[in-house]
């Protein structure tokens, strides 16, 4: 088996598709591997500031079962001889098995397609976690031996020792079967991803990143390393290649250029290679905004994925921006603002949630022009499904049919009693939410009053340990406290049917997505950063040939959209509708105000980046408003300066 310091790349791809379908025993004999090991004597190669280097002449290509824990050059030579003998035997076996493999080929391909659809070995299950940074998942994992595990992507298997988890763990896999919201799980995961997507560095332009990634995907890992790493590869070479793949290591090593750093950066490079292989490749025939418009006009089964950005124009805050909901509740003193949506915390003290729930309460029966755009797709029989992360239920106000809508995180549409399950229309508890009061279940309240009428003394008590549902009081406490009845703090509390951390996802999500990935012909991602599972992993489940278009205020670097239309969601939707003609006029009262009365005079488009295919949709009206606001602020600052005070002193408070 590989030594503790060895990183082994296994190329399980081959010219014949049948070779990939052999059973595990044969596969272990036929796989080709490339072993990365630091050069034990760097003085024999070129000296680079006396740093350790990786000599590619020490990389051995041998059958996996011939790799020993010692990795000496003598063993490598012996392994090469064994490889030649085994290759001859393999050729004879392949000739004998060729006819049988051809007969089985159709059946195997059908099984592979079914596996991809169902999210089994080849593709990820929709329940699998993605890391908290929103980076796409690399692959599932399959055991190779008792001491190793492998990661399979596009026919290339990367193997590491189980006792070295830095590379494997960076995949952020969680093998649990629960359906809890993955975002919180990932935030608490100690094995966080060691890479972050970043196109901001000046040294490497996006065009070179795209070229490097394309070569890797088209030619495989072995040829990629031969082309992009020199014969004696140093740490500098490895780091440069990581950057050239479009990633920056999250953590910097402090040990200088010693052997430990070399091995660590090799692992990070391996991780980058895996990620690139998992990223969707942009289609070469869809590159311009006109291509995007034609797709929207002609597609018949459009999947729309939406987030908080489609509702911010109505005054509903997003969650993660500097002025978003989580920033607004810092005063609660929670270790993590997301805890307001933690089920255990809600059961122990529902007051915390209801003290801030009014801030995210949806407005009464209004919706944005972007919601009208989705409704228009539905009216034209083009909407396959709208998968929304929003809990405001504004889609229903816009007229989107229930069968065309999946509310992935639940919504305020209904509310349920956490004790007896009694369900009501969500708007019934809106008055209590607006008043920062806890709404209670009428049925459980009757039970409570009935107990009180029996003359028993009642006392509200909050406990850390969650009580069972349908149990109005604790019998043990009653006996211990001489007849006193203790009601749990959350007894009979009504809770909006929002999916809290600790609750299962809506069942209709799983059913719908497994159907829709086989029907969709266009994906529109609108108003979301795609950082929260399960919605974040949908784009990775869609077949690569299906076009993907982004409509968002900011670009998303960890996904490869064919075209990105950047700007405020209402402006982008209005631009699309205006360009497609009168039959696409949005059924919203603000549509003409946004686009301008004279055929879209307020809206303009600008190409930002031809390589990334990013376009900016801007609105003159918004620009004028911003300019007026800036002028107003500038005038106020000038008045403050003339009065001899600094701006932050104007309120009488010292900075």
UniProtKB/Swiss-Prot annotation:
Disordered as annotated region, ranges: 1-148, 164-201, 455-482, 619-655
Gene Ontology biological process terms in this record: heterochromatin formation; phenotypic switching
GO MF term set: histone H4K16 deacetylase activity, NAD-dependent; metal ion binding; NAD+ binding
Active-site feature positions: 409
Positions contributing to NAD(+) binding: 307-326, 389-392, 527-529, 552-554, 569
InterPro entries: DHS-like_NAD/FAD-binding_dom (IPR029035), NAD-dep_histone_deAcase_SIR2_N (IPR007654), NAD-dep_sirtuin_deacylases (IPR050134), Sirtuin (IPR003000), Sirtuin_cat_small_dom_sf (IPR026591), Ssirtuin_cat_dom (IPR026590)
Keywords: Metal-binding, NAD, Nucleus, Repressor, Transcription, Transcription regulation, Transferase, Zinc
Keyword Zinc carried by entry: yes
Annotated catalysed reactions: N(6)-acetyl-L-lysyl-[protein] + NAD(+) + H2O = 2''-O-acetyl-ADP-D-ribose + nicotinamide + L-lysyl-[protein]
Pfam families: DUF592 (PF04574), SIR2 (PF02146)
Enzyme superclass (EC): transferase
Classification via PANTHER family: NAD-DEPENDENT PROTEIN DEACETYLASE SIRTUIN-1 (PTHR11085:SF9), NAD-DEPENDENT PROTEIN DEACYLASE SIRTUIN-5, MITOCHONDRIAL-RELATED (PTHR11085)
Listed name of the protein: NAD-dependent protein deacetylase HST1
Origin species: Candida albicans (strain SC5314 / ATCC MYA-2876)
Recorded name of the encoding gene: HST1
């Amino acid at each position: 088996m590989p030594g503790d310091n060895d990183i082994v790349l296994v190329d399980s791809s081959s010219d014949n598709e049948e070779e990939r379908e052999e059973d595990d025993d044969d596969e272990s004999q036929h796989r080709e591997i490339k072993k990365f090991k630091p050069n034990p004597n760097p003085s024999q190669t070129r000296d680079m500031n006396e740093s350790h280097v990786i000599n590619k002449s020490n990389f051995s290509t041998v059958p996996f079962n011939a790799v020993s824990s010692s990795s000496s050059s003598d063993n490598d030579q012996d392994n090469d001889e064994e490889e030649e003998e085994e290759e001859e035997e393999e050729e004879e076996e392949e000739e004998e098995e060729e006819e049988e493999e051809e007969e089985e080929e159709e059946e195997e391909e059908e099984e592979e397609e079914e596996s991809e659809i169902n999210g089994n070995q080849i593709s990820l299950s929709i329940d699998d976690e993605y890391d908290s940074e929103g980076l796409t998942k690399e692959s599932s994992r399959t055991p190779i031996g008792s001491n190793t595990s492998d990661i399979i992507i596009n026919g290339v298997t990367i193997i590491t020792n189980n006792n070295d988890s830095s590379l494997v763990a960076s995949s952020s896999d969680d093998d649990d079967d629960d359906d809890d919201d993955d975002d919180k799980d990932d935030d608490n995961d100690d094995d966080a991803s060691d890479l972050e997507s970043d196109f901001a560095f000046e040294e490497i332009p996006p065009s070179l990143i795209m070229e490097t990634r394309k070569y890797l995907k088209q030619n495989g890992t072995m040829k990629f390393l031969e082309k992009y790493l020199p014969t004696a590869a140093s740490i500098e070479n490895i780091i440069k290649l990581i950057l050239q793949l479009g990633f920056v290591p999250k953590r910097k090593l402090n040990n200088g250029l010693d052997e430990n750093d070399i091995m660590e950066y090799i692992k990070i490079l391996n991780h980058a290679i895996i990620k690139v292989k998992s990223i969707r490749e942009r289609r070469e025939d869809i590159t311009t905004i006109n291509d995007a418009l034609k797709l929207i006009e002609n597609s018949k089964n459009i999947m729309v994925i939406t987030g908080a950005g489609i509702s911010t124009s109505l005054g509903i805050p997003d969650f993660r921006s500097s002025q978003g909901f989580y920033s607004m509740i810092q005063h609660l003193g929670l270790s993590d603002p997301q805890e307001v949506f933690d089920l255990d915390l809600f059961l122990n003290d529902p007051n915390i949630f209801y003290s801030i729930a009014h801030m995210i309460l949806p407005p009464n029966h209004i919706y944005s022009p972007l919601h009208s755009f989705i409704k228009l797709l539905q009216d034209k029989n083009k909407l396959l499904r709208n998968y929304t992360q929003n809990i405001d239920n504004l889609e229903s106000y816009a007229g989107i049919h229930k069968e065309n809508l999946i509310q992935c995180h639940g919504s305020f549409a209904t509310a349920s009693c956490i004790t007896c399950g009694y369900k009501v229309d969500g708007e019934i508890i809106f008055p209590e939410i607006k008043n920062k009061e806890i709404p209670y279940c009428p049925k459980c309240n009757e039970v409570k009053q009935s107990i009180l009428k029996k003359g028993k003394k009642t006392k509200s008590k909050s406990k850390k340990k969650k009580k069972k549902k349908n149990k109005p009081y604790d019998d043990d406490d009653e006996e211990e406290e001489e007849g006193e009845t203790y009601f749990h703090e959350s007894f009979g509390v009504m809770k909006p049917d929002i999916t809290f951390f600790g609750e299962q996802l809506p069942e209709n999500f799983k059913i719908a997505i497994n159907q829709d990935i086989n029907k969709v012909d266009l994906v529109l991602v609108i108003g979301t950063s795609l950082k929260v599972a399960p919605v974040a992993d949908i784009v990775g489940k869609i077949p690569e040939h299906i076009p993907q278009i982004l409509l968002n205020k900011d670009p998303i670097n960890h996904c490869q959209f064919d075209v990105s239309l950047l700007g405020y969601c209402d402006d982008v939707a209005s631009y699309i509708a205006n360009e497609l003609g009168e039959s696409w006029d949005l059924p919203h009262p603000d549509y003409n105000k946004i686009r301008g009365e004279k055929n879209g005079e307020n809206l303009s488009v600008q190409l930002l980046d031809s390589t990334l295919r990013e376009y900016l949709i801007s609105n003159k009206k918004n620009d004028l408003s911003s300019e007026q606001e800036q002028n107003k602020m500038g005038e106020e600052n000038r008045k403050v300066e003339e009065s001899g005070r600094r701006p932050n002193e104007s309120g009488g408070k010292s900075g």
